[in-house]
Every structure is written in structure tokens, then in C-alpha cells.
């Protein structure tokens, strides 16, 4: 798959693409990332890519023409190279919230053109003409779309075969269908006692069935406390067993257990 990223700050991606476990995806070409700067397609000695908004107001707006010329070059290169046509995505507060299901869909796709906005945003005419989808990380505003683009690239890369040291690692992530969409349980490592705080004894018992049940109940308790709507979703999908429901009922009757 290939992601073409339109950004005024391609240098931000340098450390990201060569760091951490996901770099394997970029180095091996499992996830190809190509960076494009719209300044390279702007006119004049100053390579201007923004201007003041019509109607007044603070800030600057990214101009449609440099963005369009950049996008046209991307599409021409992809076509010449026989690379599949892909959607053009803008990271925006008004977009659909990115979630695990969305990441899984992108990880199985041919990629996308990712547009990273800056300043007050993009000329609306470019959005209406060229943008196929808009994605948001949440109800907050960033200085630009680069961080959001990196979040999507990282989430997609770690789902590619051979990227993680343990192939099954991502299946135990929060929100994964393998966990019925619940949050993941707490984790512990050495030493067994740290500053007077011991590891839960069940994890040292060697009884794998009991350990798995403990983890299941920790996931249920944590999800019920932090994201109760995910428990409701799992229930509606038929993922909760009678034993799960009994545990949750007991938790409701005795909330002091969840501390």
C-alpha cells in the first residue's frame, strides 16, 4: 500500500519513519510513504501557499491552486506507476472519528492521499472538488494535520504482517474484536514487588485458565468504569457470556470490588 502525504512540513515525518517497531513497515515497503510539499507547486519567488480569508477574520487560508497542482502530480505519478487509485483524505475536526474498525479497513486498503491542513484551514473549493473523506482524531484542534497523519500511518503499519515482534500482539489491543471490543487489562512485569506494591497473585500462579479469567474480568471492569458504552456494544453483539454478565451484575452490587 502507498500513502502520499501532502504537507508543508515534510521534515516532521523524518524521525517518525525511522523510529520504533513500525519503521519495519516503512523500510520494507509494506507501507510506502511519499511526502509532497505544496510549496513546490506554488508560483512566485516566495512560493506562497496561503492568503487572507475573504470576508476578514484572523489567520490565513491555504490556497486551492498549489494544493490542486500537487494532487494532480500525485495522481499522475500513481497512474504512470500502475498504483491503484485511492481516496483523498483531509484531517479535520468535522471529520468522522478514527477508530479501530477504521484502522483495520485502512490497513487492508491500497492506501490514500493524506492532506495535512495548516493555519485556518483549506480553501473550501479545494475540499469540495477533491476531498473524498475527512477524518478526525477527536473533539480538539491541532496546529496541523501532520500528527493526525502520523497517528493513522502508525496504526496501519502495526497491523501489517511481520511488523510487530509477536504476530498476535495487536489482537490483544484495546478495541480489537479478539477482545470483543473491550479495553485491555492491566499488565505487570518484574520485580514481583515494587515499592511495597505486589503483582496480583493470580498472575504468578501458573494456572492459565484462572489467569485468562482474571484478565477477562479486569477488561470488563475497566471497560465498564471507563467506557461503559463499549460494554453495551459487546452485549448487543452477543459477546458477553452468562459468566461475564454475572460478574458485571456483582460489580454493580459491590462497586468497591472495582478499585
UniProtKB/Swiss-Prot annotation:
UniProt-annotated location(s): Cytoplasm
CC per GO annotation: cytosol
Catalytic activity, as annotated: guanosine(37) in tRNA + S-adenosyl-L-methionine = N(1)-methylguanosine(37) in tRNA + S-adenosyl-L-homocysteine + H(+)
InterPro entries hit by this protein: Alpha/beta_knot_MTases, tRNA_m1G_MeTrfase_C_sf, tRNA_m1G_MeTrfase_TrmD, tRNA_m1G_MTases_N, tRNA_MeTrfase_TRMD/TRM10
UniProt-listed Pfam families: tRNA_m1G_MT (PF01746)
GO molecular function: tRNA (guanine(37)-N1)-methyltransferase activity
Keywords annotated in UniProt: Cytoplasm, Methyltransferase, S-adenosyl-L-methionine, Transferase, tRNA processing
S-adenosyl-L-methionine keyword on record: yes
Biological process, per Gene Ontology: tRNA N1-guanine methylation
Keyword 4Fe-4S carried by entry: no
Chief localization: cytoplasm
EC number: 2.1.1.228
List of residues binding S-adenosyl-L-methionine: 117, 137-142
Complex and partners: Homodimer.
Role this protein plays: Specifically methylates guanosine-37 in various tRNAs.
Similarity annotation: Belongs to the RNA methyltransferase TrmD family.
Protein name: tRNA (guanine-N(1)-)-methyltransferase
Organism, scientific name: Polaromonas sp. (strain JS666 / ATCC BAA-500)
Upper classification of the organism: Bacteria, Pseudomonadati, Pseudomonadota, Betaproteobacteria, Burkholderiales
